[in-house]
């Protein structure tokens, strides 16, 4: 089975501490699939919520299909995510008890299906973000020093 990356939420790893990852399918309309094939999907600032024992992806953008007609889809509509009932029940427990968030990390093709990799995440504090930036800068500096010495 081949995996082809469609979009990635790069800010998610900076703003959140990812505790666990889950793969979910998405219910899409025809023009949405065509727009995704054209690379017009954005995961930034989107999240997933549980509503009546179902999981929905909110605030994710799939741009209008250029060659669509009057029946083109809404770019920011809520989209149902497909998971097993047992997984959804576990997510409900994690979100309610521990105050965690469900955020999309990546979107990719798995065969002919579009999948979302969801992260169960805890928001980072400002000092955690600073520490992450400091560590990343140190790693870059270390690599630069090692490169110049060889």
Swiss-Prot record:
Subcellular location: Cytoplasm
Single GO molecular function: RNA binding
Keywords, alphabetical: Cytoplasm, RNA-binding
PROSITE patterns assigned: SSRP
Biological process, per Gene Ontology: trans-translation
CDD domains hit by this protein: SmpB
GO cellular component: cytosol
Gene3D superfamilies documented for this protein: 2.40.280.10
Pfam families per the UniProt record, alphabetical: SmpB (PF01668)
Lineage top rank: taxon: Bacteria
InterPro entries: SmpB (IPR023620), SsrA-bd_prot (IPR000037), SsrA-bd_prot_CS (IPR020081)
Family from the record: Belongs to the SmpB family.
Purpose: Required for rescue of stalled ribosomes mediated by trans-translation. Binds to transfer-messenger RNA (tmRNA), required for stable association of tmRNA with ribosomes. tmRNA and SmpB together mimic tRNA shape, replacing the anticodon stem-loop with SmpB. tmRNA is encoded by the ssrA gene; the 2 termini fold to resemble tRNA(Ala) and it encodes a 'tag peptide', a short internal open reading frame. During trans-translation Ala-aminoacylated tmRNA acts like a tRNA, entering the A-site of stalled ribosomes, displacing the stalled mRNA.
Name of the protein in its database record: SsrA-binding protein
Organism: Magnetococcus marinus (strain ATCC BAA-1437 / JCM 17883 / MC-1)
Source lineage: Bacteria, Pseudomonadati, Pseudomonadota, Alphaproteobacteria, Magnetococcales
Encoding gene, per UniProt annotation: smpB
